[in-house]
Structure formats: structure tokens, C-alpha cells
Design a protein with these regions (language model features):
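Substrate-binding/access-modulating region of protease and related hydrolase catalytic domains
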Residues: 150-229, 279-282, 286
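Gly/Ser-rich catalytic serine loop of serine hydrolases
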Residues: 113-122, 221, 279-291
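C-terminal subdomain of the subtilisin-like protease fold in secreted/lumenal serine endopeptidases
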Residues: 184, 302-415
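Extracellular S/T/G-rich loop segment that most often corresponds to the catalytic His/Ser-adjacent loop
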Residues: 228-300, 304
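Structural recognition of the beta-strand scaffold that forms the well-ordered cores
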Residues: 83-87, 140-145, 176, 181-186, ...
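Protease zymogen maturation seam
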Residues: 2-7, 19-25, 31-81
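Solvent-exposed loop/turn segments at secondary-structure junctions
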Residues: 89-93, 109-111, 133, 147-151, ...
Length: 416
């Protein structure tokens, strides 16, 4: 059985088994990359290319009926008035699936992309805002391109200040500056200990403080606590993948302590720019924007709810009985119908993913210091709203900050 119909609050989604893994029914493509490189969460695994040409149009997807999106559209839930961001590969806005979609490339520098990353980025954008089968045909989508493994960043992506304009941390900040309410990230880092990536910790601290929802995939390595997944970070909604029958996608989806929810991971049809065909692909890259889009539908329905209440709504309407958590699907698969039909004002204004684990980053202290203006001033370089309020006078004339520092004015100094 699928998720709840949009016309009712009854939860009919099945519970999910405790085992899940990989990509598209065959060997998953690992997300291991070079230390500073990014990878595609979906693993770009192509399954059984369909005998079609790239100039054919994809008109529907299996998830459209599974999530009862026809009912959502009939009731006017189309993402109208919501701004969502994706950090990914480039989007081919000339693709017929994206005709009429409201998409703007907000990248701050030139990214040298390839067909693989264009296939991925265009697929994610189509899932979000395609007029044919997107969750949010009337939403505003901002795209931010990043440089993937094997690609050389352009010179204009490397400013003198040292933080790349096509990096994840800067892209999160740009998305928030531009007014995005929800950010979907279907990429992964290299298999490294990234706890001390200060710019990323600062960007997520900002998102937590300003109520911006960040959704990211668990990865496609069929492993526990995939080291390449950004879902291990505090402040992120970690998404694993399920199949259409509700079972955990154990042949590819990663899992672990940081999973929050799950969604259909494929296969979906994609426009493959390498082969010139329409192909099928699966991965947590697909599940991630489904969760982000579902939250966007909830944002449209409940404009007065805080982002924390929407996150509480997500975990309280998951498919697991009595909101029980497990390390496969978190609190259970996302249920867009229940998100639309359940009033989030009944839930506390508390972020349920801000502190996933005691040893996860950014720490509660980092989040608090950023909100208090005590984070080192360079960490606010791409934050148009950041005011340094600490006591280090070397930042009094910091030209890299948009806002003038106000030394010694942090509320932390007056807090008992």
C-alpha cells in the first residue's frame, strides 16, 4: 500500500523491514571520492536503458501515483508560493520535461560540468518542478551548481578569501541569502572525517538558527553510517530509500544513526545525456528531493507553522507505528498526504534534528555561538545577515562581511 491519500489523514503506509541497502537492484555504485570531491548520491547507476531517444518526453513516473500527486494537484497543493533550492549538477532547462517550470540558476561562478552531472541535476529538478510529474509544479526552484569528482573548477570559483563559491557551505549560504525555505542536497562528500569543516558547520548552524530545512541523502553504499553522507551532520534531515512495496531498498541505500525518514528511491526515468536515451535509475538522490518536496507541500498548506514544527510533523506522521525510530527508515517513510492533512501547530517549536548525536557537528555550542554572533567572523563571509558581535577587534574593519561588526554586543554576554 502507498502513502496516505491527500483527502484523508488516515496513515496507510506499510512499516518497513529493518534491512535495507543499495542502488537499483544490482551492485550499488559506491560514493567514495577524492578527499575534497563531491559525488552524486544516486551513484548514476543506469538500469536497462529504454529504447527511446532523448528528444522523447518523459510524461510520468511511478511515484506520481504512489504518492497520489494527482489528488494533491486537484486540491491545489502544487508548491505555489514556496521557494526550494537544490545543490547539485547543472539543470538543462531546455529539457521538455521542464517546459514551463520556474527554475533559476543562482550559481555564483562558472562550473565545468559533464553529461553525468547534467543528467543528475536535470533529473532532480524534474522530480521537483516538472509540470508533467513534479511534486511542486508551481514552486520556485533555485539551482546551485557544484563541481563533482573529475571536474576542474573554474578560476572564478576560487576567490581570494579561500572558500570556493561552488562549495557546499557557500551554496547553502547563497540559497538562504536568496530566500530558499528548503534546501535539497543529493550529493555526498569523500570518505573522510569532515567534522571540522568549519565553513560547513557554520552554514548548517546558520540554517538551524534561521529555520531553513536542509534535506540530504544517506548514500548508496549499503552501509551503516556511510562516511560520505552529509546526513551525519546535525541540522539535516537524513533520507534513506524504500521500494514501491514499502520495503527498505537494501541493495543500495545506506542507513544508520543519522537517518530521519525514507522515501521512494526509484527506479525513475531520467534523460541520460551520455547515451542520448531515456534510462532508469535509482538511489537516495531520488528519495531526498521527494522528502524535500513533501515538506514544501506542507509549507504551502501550513504557512504559519515554524520550520521546527514542520520537522516535528515529518517525524510524527512517518509510517513507523507510534513514531518508533529505527536505523533503516528513521521514524518511517514520508507521507505527503499526512503532512498536508495534519496541523503542525500541535507540535513543539523545537528542532528534532538539530542534535542528532552528542558527537555530531555542528555542536550545540557552535549553533549557539553562530546565532549569538560569536562565531569567528570569516565563517560569516557568505552570510548576508551575519553580524559579528564578539570581542576580537581584528574584525572591526572586516571587508569580507556584509554587515558591520558590533564588538561586544553578543547576547551571550548578558545571558545568565
Amino acid at each position: 500500500m502507498g502513502p496516505t491519500p491527500v483527502v484523508t489523514t488516515h496513515k496507510s503506509a506499510p512499516r518497513h523491514p529493518r534491512m535495507f541497502a543499495g542502488v537499483a537492484g544490482r551492485a550499488a555504485r559506491a560514493l567514495t571520492t577524492a578527499a575534497s570531491a563531491l559525488a552524486l548520491c544516486v551513484g548514476a547507476l543506469v538500469v536497462a536503458p529504454a529504447p527511446a531517444h532523448a528528444d522523447d518526453t518523459i510524461t510520468t513516473q511511478d511515484y506520481f501515483s504512489y504518492y497520489k500527486l494527482d489528488q494533491a494537484r486537484a486540491k491545489g497543493y502544487t508548491g505555489k508560493g514556496v521557494t526550494i533550492a537544490m545543490i547539485d549538477g547543472p539543470v538543462d532547462t531546455s529539457a521538455p520535461e521542464l517546459a514551463g517550470a520556474n527554475i533559476t540558476d543562482k550559481s555564483r561562478c562558472t562550473v565545468n560540468s559533464d553529461n553525468k552531472s547534467k543528467t543528475h541535476g536535470t533529473a532532480i529538478a524534474s522530480l521537483l518542478v516538472s509540470k508533467n510529474y513534479g511534486f511542486l509544479p508551481d514552486a520556485t526552484l533555485y539551482s546551485y551548481q557544484t563541481t563533482f569528482e573529475g571536474q576542474a573548477p573554474s578560476e572564478d570559483c576560487n576567490p581570494d578569501i579561500g572558500t570556493r563559491l561552488d562549495g557546499l557551505a557557500s551554496s547553502i549560504n547563497f540559497a538562504i541569502n536568496d530566500g530558499a525555505q528548503i534546501i535539497s542536497i543529493s550529493i555526498a562528500a569523500g570518505q573522510i572525517d569532515a567534522k571540522f569543516e568549519a565553513p560547513l558547520n557554520a552554514a548548517l548552524s546558520r540554517a538551524i538558527n534561521q529555520g531553513i530545512i536542509v534535506v540530504t541523502g544517506m548514500g548508496n553504499t549499503s552501509t551503516d553510517n556511510d562516511g560520505g553522507s552529509y546526513a551525519s551532520r546535525n541540522g539535516t534531515v537524513g533520507v534513506s530509500a524504500i521500494n514501491l512495496d514499502g520495503s527498505f531498498a537494501s541493495d543500495y541505500s545506506s542507513y544508520g544513526d543519522s537517518v530521519t525518514t525514507a522515501a521512494f528511491g526509484g527506479p525513475i526515468k531520467v534523460r541520460d545525456y551520455d547515451t542520448g536515451q531515456i534510462s532508469d535509475t535509482s538511489g537516495t538522490s531520488i528519495a531526498t528531493p521527494i522528502v524535500a518536496a513533501s515538506l514544501a507541500l506542507a509549507r504551502q498548506k501550513w504557512p504559519d507553522a515554524t520550520s521546527n514544527q514542520l520537522l516535528q510533523l515529518l517525524i510524527h506522521t512517518g509510517s513507523n507505528s507510534q513514531q518508533a525510530w529505527n536505523n533503516r527508515t528513521g521514524y518511517g517513510a514520508v507521507n505527503p498526504g499526512a503532512l498536508i492533512n495534519t496541523d503542525p501547530s500541535q507540535y513543539p517549536d523545537e528542532n528534532p534534528v538539530s542534535q542528532k548525536a552528542d558527537d555530531a557537528y555542528p555542536t550545540a555550542e557552535m549553533v549557539r555561538d553562530y546565532g549569538d554572533g560569536r562565531a569567528d567572523a570569516p565563517l560569516g563571509t557568505f552570510d548576508d545577515t551575519y553580524v559579528y558581535r564578539g570581542t576580537d577587534d581584528i574584525y572591526i574593519h572586516a571587508e569580507f562581511l556584509t554587515q558591520t561588526p558590533h564588538l561586544g554586543t553578543s547576547p551571550a554576554y548578558h545571558r545568565k
